Structures are given as C-alpha cells and as structure tokens.
Amino acid sequence: MATSKSQQFQLIEGMELQITVTGLPNGSSVRAEFHLKNCTRAWILHWGCIYQGNNHWYIPSEHSSKQGALQTTFVKSGDAYVVILELRDPRVRAIEFVLKDGSHNRWLRQHNGNFRVEIPWNDLHAHHRIPKTLIERRAHKIWDRKGRPQSSAREQQIDYDNAVRELHAELARGISLDELQANSTVPVEKEETSEPHHTMIQSYRRKHDVQKWLQKYTEPINRSGSVKSSALAELSKRSVGQENLVSQKSFHVRNYEITVLQRDVKGDCRLWIATNMAGPTVLHWGVAKSSAGEWLIPPPDVLPEKSKFVHGACQTQFTDMSSREHSYQFIDINLKRGGFVGIQFVIWSGGYWVNNNGANFVVNLKSADSTSGKLDVDEKYVLKWLLDEISEREKEAERSLMHRFNIATELTERCKDEGEGGCIGIMVWMRFMATRHLTWNKNYNVKPREISEALERFTNLMEKIYLQQPNKREIVRLTMALVGRGGQGDVGQRIRDEILVIQRNNHCKSGMMEEWHQKLHNNSSADDVIICEALLNYVRSDFRIDAYWQTLQTNGLTKERLASYDRPIVSEPRFRSDSKEGLIRDLTMYLKTLKAVHSGADLESAIDTFLSPSKGHHVFAVNGLSPKLQDLLNLVKRLVREENTEPLIEKLVDARIQLHPALRAPRTRAKDLLFLDIALESCFKTTIEKRLISLNFNNPPEIIYVICVVLENLCLSIVNNEEIIFCTKDWYRVSEAYRPHDVQWALQTKAVLDRLQLVLADRCQHYFTIIQPTAKYLGQLLRVDKHGIDVFTEEVIRAGPGAVLSTLVNRFDPSLRKIANLGCWQVISSADAYGFVVCVNELIVVQNKFYSKPTVIIASKVTGEEEIPAGVVAVLTPSMIDVLSHVSIRARNSKICFATCFDQNVLSNLKSKEGRAISIHTKSTGLVISDGNNSDVSVRHIFISSVPRGVISKGKKFCGHYVISSKEFTDERVGSKSYNIKFLRERVPSWIKIPTSAALPFGTFENILSDDSNKDVARRISVLKDSLNRGDLTKLKSIQEAILQMSAPMALRNELITKLRSERMPYLGDESGWNRSWVAIKKVWASKWNERAYVSCKKNKLDHDAVCMAVLIQEVICGDYAFVIHTNNPVSGDSSEIYTEIVKGLGETLVGAYPGRAMSFITKKTNLKSPTVISYPSKRIGLYSKPSIIFRSDSNNEDLEGNAGAGLYDSVIMDEAEEVVVDYSREPLIMDKSFRVRLFSAIAEAGNVIESIYGCPQDIEGVVKGGHIYIVQARPQV
C-alpha cells in the first residue's frame, strides 16, 4: 500500500495551497500534487529537493537545470491551479519551494523562508528481513576488499556487522531485496592455472554510485532584491562608457557584488567602484605605489567628494545611482597620473565590515598601454599583466627556489580573483620550472628550511584557492602535482642535518658525497630526490656504477646538469663495501625526508603524512572518513612494494573513492587530502600503463574491467565531470549486458566508446584553448626553446588521467568492430571515384575552393554543416557523421564518395599518399582503395559527368501580405517546405500530427528592405554585394550583419500577432517576444548570405540573386525524440527498406553540426513491425526548448531537381534551446526492447504512409511527443 501525507498553507489574498505527497511502498517513486485554490492567475513553483543529511537544494536526477532549481508553472484544472511532480530519486527526503508570481515579479515565502513538505517514506527495514546468506556474501565482499587478510573471530564479526549496516543502507535508498540478491554472487575460488588473465573473468561486474561524484560548478542563484550580479558590471559600463576601459574586475561576497572599472581618461587613471549594497555605504581604502601588498594613504589631490582621512586610510561615501529598473551605488576616483600599482579596500555597510573572505579587496592597476602587450596573443585566455611581471621577475626568481616560491605566492595572491587565466599562468610557470627549462639556483646560498617554508606558503595558498574557487580545482591539482609539500619547523632543516649523519655513520665525508652535501646546504631541490634514488640503486646493485647513471638519466639528470649547480657534483660515488647495509638504511630514511619536502605526488610520503595526526586534528575523525580508507591505504603500500599491478589498480581507485567525499568539502587539512589524492592518481597512472603491456584486447571481460576502473578514476579527477559520469554509468550497463560474440552488445559498446572518444577529444581541445596561449606567450618571454613550447599542452594532457583511457579505447575498438561485423569504413555516400589526394585539418576551411582536377579530400574534421568544394570526388574522414546530416545528403545528390574511417593506420597510410592519385571502389564491405592508374577512365568520366549542369532559380513576387496562414499557402507564395505541410495536413491519417503553421511569403524581405526606414541598410547591402560579385567572400558576413540592422514596419508586427494567435500558437506578442521573433526572422533572411549557401549556388551554377526566402513559422514541438526518415535506404539504395535516425530532444542535433551519432534503424516495408537497429547513439547533447516558435528557411531553390539544398539555410528558434548532456544509461530506447519496437514501428509506418501519399521516396523530419508522431517537414528524397 502507498503511504501519503497532506499539508495545507494559507497564503495571501485568500489563496490556499494544499499538498498531497504519496510514496509507493517499493520506495522507488514519489508523487506530489500541489493544488492552488482561490487564485486568479497561474503562479510558478520554484522548487528543489532535499537529500538526507543535507540542507542544500538539489535537482532530482531525472531533470537538469542550470540555475540550481526547477520552475514548474501551475496549470488550470477545474476551480484550482495544479502542479503534479513525480520523483524517482530515492535519496529525496523533502521538497522545498517558494511561489513566484511571474506577472508581477514577486516571490511568496513562508515566514521569510522556504515552504517545505516531507516525503513519507516507509520503514523499509521493517518490511524486509535480510537473509543470512545475503549478509554472509556481503561480509565476504568486505573481506575481499580488504585484500583477504588472515582475520580473527572478532574481525570476522566486525565484517559481518558492517555487512548488515551496508545492506540496510542500500534498502533505505530504494534498492530492492531482489536486486541485492542478484548482485551478491561470490566468485568461486579456483585453483591457479597457467592461463593468463583468468582471474579477470568475474571481476568485470564492478559498479559504484558514480552519480554521487558529480561536480558541476556554476554561478550561485542571486537571491537579493537588488541588481543581479550579471547586470551590475553592464550597468556600470553603460554609465561610464566602454571606449576608454582598461580593465574590469568583480568581487562576489554573500549576496553582494562589487565591480571595479579602470579607465584611461586623457592619460588619467580613473576608477569606478560600484556595488549593489543598499543603505549608507563607505569605502575604506588605501593605495599601493611599489607593490600590490602596500597600503598607503592616498594623496589629498586624488580624493573624491565626500571623503576624509581616518587612521592611516581614506574613507569615501558611496553615491546612489537609480534607473527605472535598478539601483546601485558608486564612487568615481581620479588617481590622475600618480603611478599607483593598485588599491586595497574594505566596505562598511549595514553596521558591519564587508571584506574579501577575511582579506582586503585588492585591485591591480594597469598602465593604459599595457593591454597592447609585448607579443601578439589572444587576451581571452591570457592574463598578460601577470605573465609580463613573471618575465620581469624571472631574474630574481632564478636565484633560488625560495625566491621563486615567494614570488609565486605573491603573484598568485594578486591574480587569484582574475579568472582561470591567473591560475593557468602560475601553473605554466611552475611547469617550465619543473621540466628544467628555467634555472633553479644562481649565485645564492639558501637553507633547505627556507625553501621548505617558502614552498609551504605557496601550497597553503593553493589550498585556499582549491577550497574557495571550486571551478579552478583542476588547475590547482596540476600545479600542486609539480611542486613539493614544503613545511615549517624542522621539516626542511632535517635535509641539512641528516646528510651529515649519513656521512658520519658511513665514512663518506669526501668525494661525491661531500659535493652533494654542499649542494644540499646551498640549494636543495627535487633533483636531490633523484640523486638519492640513484645512490640507493647503486648500493643495492653491489656498487655497480651503471645503475647510478641509469637512474639519473631515466629521470632527466645528466652529467652536465650535475656539473651546472652552484655547488657542482662532478665525482662518481665511492663507498666502502662493508657500509652497504648502513647506507641502504640511512639513504632510505633520508629519501623520505627529501620527498616530504620536494615530492608532493610521492605516494608513500603522502600516505604517511595523511595518517599522522596534525595539530591535534586526526584527519579521519574531523572529515568523517571511513576506517576502511586506512585499511586500503595500508594495503596499497604493501601492493606497491610487491609490484602486484592487478589488485593495486582496483585498490588505488577504491582508496580515492573513500577519500572523495572529504575532498569535495574538507573540514580541515585539505592540503593533506589533496596531496594524497594526487599521489594515488599518479600511482594509478603509472600502474595502469604497466598493465597495458600484458592486456589481451581480444578478451572483452578483461578490457571491460580495466576501462571500468579507468573511467572511475577519471570521474574522480576532473571538475565538471557530468558527461564522464554518464559515460561511466553507460559502461556499467554494457558491462552487465556482456554476452560473448553478441553483435547488438558490440554495437552498444561501440557507441559508448565513440562517445568517450568525442569527450576526450573535446577535453584535449579545451586544454589547448585555455593553456597553450599562455604557454606560448610566457615561453617566448622566458626564451624557452620552441619545442618545449610547442609540446607544452600535449605533455600536460599525456600526463593526465584521460591519456590511458584514450589508449584503451583505441586498442579495443578493432576488436569490437570485429564482433559487430563492422569494417574499418562506414560508407555514407556510395560512389566510385578517382582523384588526387589532398589532406586538410577541417573541411570547412576549403569549402569555397575550386579544384581544377579530380580531388580526394582527407579531412581530419567534418562537422556535417559544410559544403563539399567543387572538383572534389571523395571526402574521407575519421569524424562520425550522421547518414542523414545535411552534408551527407548533398554528397549523395552530387554522387560524391563520402565515408568515415575507423582505422587510424588506414587513414595514416592514405595521408602518406598526398599529391598522388588513388582509385576508390565501393563494395558491400566498405571501400577498396588502390593507387591510381591509366585504367581508371570510367571513374574519371564519373567526375566529369557529375558536375551539376545548373538549375535556374525563378524569382518570386510579394503577395501584399507580410504573414499568411497555412490555408493561404501556394507554390507562388511559399517554398516547397511550407507547401508540403499544407499538402500533408489535408491527407495524413489523424494519428499522424502536423504542427500549426504560418509563413512570411516570398518577397517580404525585399519589400521591407525597400522601405524608407531601411534605405541606409539597403544602400550598404548594395555596395557590399558589388564587392561580393567581384569575388570578395569576406563581405558575406558584413551583409548578414547589415540585415540584422533592418527595422520592421508596424504592419508586420500586427499581422504576425494576429495570424499566430489565430493558429493558436504559443506566442504572446509582448515587446520581448516580438523583439526575439524579429531577430529570428532576420537571421533566417541573412542566412541566404552564409558562406556555405553562397558557395553551393556558385558551384551548382545557380543565380544567387534570384534566390527568394520565405519563412515557415511553426510551433516548436517540445518532444521526447526527433527523427529523420528516408523511405529509400540511402546507404544501400534498397527501395524496400526505410532508413531512420533518431535523437533525444530537438532534431537540430541530428541535422546540424553536433558531434556524435544518432541511433539508426532500418525497417522492411513488408514487415514494419520488425525494425533492426544498426547503430546506437553517441550524441553528447540533447536540445530542449520551452513552448516556443521556430522560424524555418523556405527558399525557392532548396528542392530543385538535381540540386539538394538541404541545410544550406538556417532555421532559428525564437527562444534559445537549452543544451542538456544526455544520459543513456537508463534510456528506454536502449533498455526497453518492447518500447523500442513499438516506437520504431510507428515511425516507420508514418514514413510509409507519407511515401504512399506522394508516390515517391521521401525525406521526412518528425518529432515524438508523449507517444504521438508529429511530422514537421517532408520533401522528395534526392
């Protein structure tokens, strides 16, 4: 029986809110009904979920929202307004909400707080008696996780009790007893055999609740009644103008924002400081002359009005500034030409001081000409003032590591609030140092203790940034992995003291050991860790000198490097033979001392530091960590010593999983937590790389397991890890579904790997975008060699957690293709070809070129939006392109060979043939490619005869109305896209839905452009077209920009509102809605001049000036899925098969340039009830829209005979669609076969019906919403 709970709230104006919440007995879902009575208009429910043990709002897992909460509009039902929520997240313990009156922009709360309703969960413990066998199996798993130690009776009882607690907790989370039984099998112990990898067979059933590891960091919701945070800076810039703006900086503290704009006004430095604080507010400030850390009293001649001097500072009152929508306060300070380098301030408001999280607000000032910089660089990703100052201070930094870390601390403090660019700049500088591109010591003697203390100050600041700015955590991790931990007190001093003890105990006070002793006293560094390891290997090998040099050289230390120290090491080690044991003991202990300071990523050192109490705080007790972590860490240390890679891989990740909750929100000793996690990750990477050598990629269970663990490790390593988490959940799904030699399993697994490849490629590109510009700029300033600069980001990526996953995916892919009966080619457009090979990075770069001889393009990247250049007979690419994308359709229409290659070796071989001729023949198994020769005459003929002959577009006249209804559509007023909608509406059966439509007919654009209000725009377009006709394609963008400046006649607005309301479309016609729709209309018109469309017209010998653009207006169907049907299989040419591709959300991800593949299936027309899936989805993004209007291009040349115009022009949604990362792990299309067959059969039947109406093959676009089929477009299939 379901349990329920009701609550009532008496609201303002006599309104009453009644809530009934029902929880089902299986604990899997909750239904909440909100009934708002006695109200006259629809309110909005602004809500979020509360999880057990947490007071923050969370978004239930089946939804997505960028704002951190969800908004649901009440719907009229009888005499009340109703919202019904269904939640399937068993973690939800309460729903909190407020009510929003959208029409009056006001909020309704309960006593200045949130309304709250508890979820009536059943007492699951009382309903389930856990079988003893299940408890024993779980206890066995707990014992196995600990490494199967010899356990006493008491330890066995502890495992049993822990098993009971775990099972009760899982039942409380909504997991059924049957599921627990199914997942509780204990692997049967078998005798060891000589067969490799045998122990991996049972291990692949690994699964964690990775959703708990989600990290998404976005701007917090603004809850103040003042100016929104995103608006204050814009208001300030509107107030002072942007023409003289030098820099901009914003601070966010609680609900307050402070914006500081620096301007250059006739050579004077002017500061505009604005805040959204209310009431009397005072700026308490000082200036800096020589360094940002100074606080000096400003000179009297720079004081603004309402200022006074107080106790070593100046205080200035803010002035109110109000507008119709917003109000804020400001101060305008003219620092003139005083040569100040910065200012510091705090603010007094509301009876207390406002500061920057315990520190002063600091603003570094820039000279007006500093923005020009010393080198050409894109400032979007580079904090130039920081890099310039690093360059200027490098001479000081190279004196010693103490100097370098002290300067790094100072600069990091100054730049930490200036976006990611600041932290990236520091990381790049530290990496140039760590890779020995910079000098570590020059003519300066510094104690190890001083280096250690300087390093600790730097890492303490990194810890602070990690805690306060979660979006920078990846960069902070990269930085801390490059440096040591540092330490106060005797930590650094022990380096100096213990070397003397080693020399005395082992009688080695001269030679190499004395040279090293002098080097350690003068300037200890990370090199000393390597030297100590080399000495240990030398001693352990019975004093073989080659072991010493091999260790040094493996780690990048050469004889020249040793000799270059201020205190050079030029001698080789020489020890007494009877000192071996003492040296091993003493050097081993000394290595720990060195690593404690210089090697933050050393695992043993990190574990020892982590487990030791610090300042009375035990890290486990304070951070709420499980004792299981301590067992895992001790086990890891043992496995590392044993070099047992198979169990070590799993235990390293298990340790990170146990550490992760504390690492996300540490209460104390965050630096120790972070260094431990970095060390675990580093050890994992090293171990898995060793494991790669012996992996059998033809044994799927083994590879499934390894990829599983690597994915979990990656989830734990990156910020904004939502998509990797979804891929990991999907990988769990295919792991559990594994069946040997199962084709459908291989296709599903291939789709997951395809998506992973896209995610990893995108992540690499992101790193190149944000890191490489800084590396290039700073590297040139510091005179780093060109190779070191060029490979900088590549080396960062290869050292990261994604590199090994990329290797695994690439090596497993051929095995999967073999199981799935896939070759190395997917043929998208089948045609034989002969041509000369040309290699390009991106097809779009050459889309407007004309090749005078038949050309085969090998393009590293194709998006699906491009036009194939004239003269090209084939396009080969590794990019995964949908068969029904626009570029695919145009390739088939032009009889151009178009194919995706999955084998990098094949592709590399083809690229090596650049400049030479090749022949391509299409077979049922893929492509057969050979070197070109004189026998390819027939293929050459194909090239010559396939050049389009040219179809003349016929101009269209304006009908006298700006907007017409679908009943008024004729082929003289609208294009085939609109006319076909009218044709279909009159003929399709009732179960096929057609969305409501209207149109702006042909000639509307030309008529409005000729209006007097647009004469300047018309004149500008005419001039630009003259240049365009002379071959200047750069004018295309200028024409589009000019069209966006057009003004609309009032009659257009009135007609649009009238027609759309008569068609019952969701169009309010208010000022905001009109403005958005007018912009969308102009964007559709402007798309006539996009480069792709213009080049296509010229290539096909069409008169571009004769192209007319109608605009089809349709209601956006906010569906579950979107699909495209070709009723004649375009891949095989089989007219008895219907080919369909389907995606989640809106169809733009299918036909547009969105990476990944759609799900595809074929259906025999003679057996519509038996669709066959031929590929599973790897699309990363789903597009979702609220009820809105779409404006579709409908030109007079898109569907002419012999010309495929699909996708040449743009369609624009009035309200921007939201991009949502897709989670396929529970997708019914994949998981529920009966649902899939029903839906696919209905789609195929709709395609068959429409083909029969037209009597020829059709290209159909449609939407699935609530099980209903909507057709939004149909055209003849080319």
Curated annotation (Swiss-Prot):
UniProt keyword Kinase present: yes
Annotated Gene Ontology cellular component terms: chloroplast envelope
EC identifiers of the protein: 2.7.9.4
MF term (GO), any: alpha-glucan, water dikinase activity
One of the Pfam families matching this protein, by short name: PPDK_N
InterPro entries given in the database record: ATP_grasp_subdomain_1, CWD_DUF7067, GWD-like_N_Ig, GWD1_pHisD, PPDK_AMP/ATP-bd
Active site, UniProt feature: H886 (tele-phosphohistidine intermediate)
EC top class named in words: transferase
PANTHER family: ALPHA-GLUCAN WATER DIKINASE 1, CHLOROPLASTIC-RELATED (PTHR46999), ALPHA-GLUCAN WATER DIKINASE 2 (PTHR46999:SF4)
Miscellaneous notes: The reaction takes place in three steps, mediated by a phosphocarrier histidine residue located on the surface of the central domain. The two first partial reactions are catalyzed at an active site located on the C-terminal domain, and the third partial reaction is catalyzed at an active site located on the N-terminal domain. For catalytic turnover, the central domain swivels from the concave surface of the C-terminal domain to that of the B-terminal domain.
Subunit note: Homodimer.
Stated name of the protein: Alpha-glucan water dikinase 2
Species the sequence originates in: Arabidopsis thaliana
